[in-house]
Amino acid sequence: MVESQIIARGVSDRRVIEAMLKVPRHVFVEEAMAAQAYSDTPLPIGEKQTISQPYMVALMTELLELKGKEKVLEIGTGSGYQAAILAVMADRVYTVERIRPLALRARKALDSLGLLNVNIKMSDGTVGWEDEAPFDAIIVTAGAPDIPQQYIDQLKPGGRLVIPVGTQFEQVLVRVVKQEDGSVERENITGCRFVKLVGKFGWSSDD
């Protein structure tokens, strides 16, 4: 999976590659989907949610430029797979999931791998996690109509934010770097498709 789907498509950060090799993706999918766990495609995980394709996980993680000592916020725990990759690469991971069954399942999977540096909160991810801010990096695994200001506010100067922004059906992956004066530099990376980011500062669940 890593050689053909990730390295071949341009991901070169050695720490990302090592994390992808270390974390078993099949642990984070339902048993019936285990045979497809290492294909480069999103897979359903229940509750109308998906586990992201491995390439997108690798790309988004690479864009965070993690060195090992960071405090990272993830919005949208989902299966827990992205949080597991972050846990291998960073010091502390804080992840927010609004759907209780997914949060509980992710916690169980992370614990089974001994990844105890991940904190999961069941809440509205669009408001971030103010009590634990600021963060060195923030990654959002659902598509937003725009970038919530809360994420910018909770990012350290020099911090990186990676988030899909667009419509409910297609987005552009955006990388934001917060400057020392509080301003931001924004870069569009590539087109993508994620489930919608639901919450106070995202999409309505009825949209």
Swiss-Prot record:
Subcellular location: Cytoplasm
Alphabetical list of HAMAP family matching this protein: PIMT
Originating organism: Geobacter sulfurreducens (strain ATCC 51573 / DSM 12127 / PCA)
Transmembrane segments: none
A GO molecular function held by the record: protein-L-isoaspartate (D-aspartate) O-methyltransferase activity
Gene Ontology cellular-component annotations: cytoplasm
EC number assigned by the record: 2.1.1.77
Family: Belongs to the methyltransferase superfamily. L-isoaspartyl/D-aspartyl protein methyltransferase family.
The name this protein goes by in its record: Protein-L-isoaspartate O-methyltransferase
NCBIfam families for the chain: pimt (TIGR00080), PRK00312.1 (NF001453)
Stated role: Catalyzes the methyl esterification of L-isoaspartyl residues in peptides and proteins that result from spontaneous decomposition of normal L-aspartyl and L-asparaginyl residues. It plays a role in the repair and/or degradation of damaged proteins.
Major localization listed first in the record, in broad terms: cytoplasm
Positions of the catalytic residues: S52
Record key words, sorted: Cytoplasm, Methyltransferase, S-adenosyl-L-methionine, Transferase
Domain of life per record: Bacteria
UniProt enzyme class: transferase
GO biological process: methylation; protein modification process; protein repair
Substrates-to-products reaction catalysed: [protein]-L-isoaspartate + S-adenosyl-L-methionine = [protein]-L-isoaspartate alpha-methyl ester + S-adenosyl-L-homocysteine
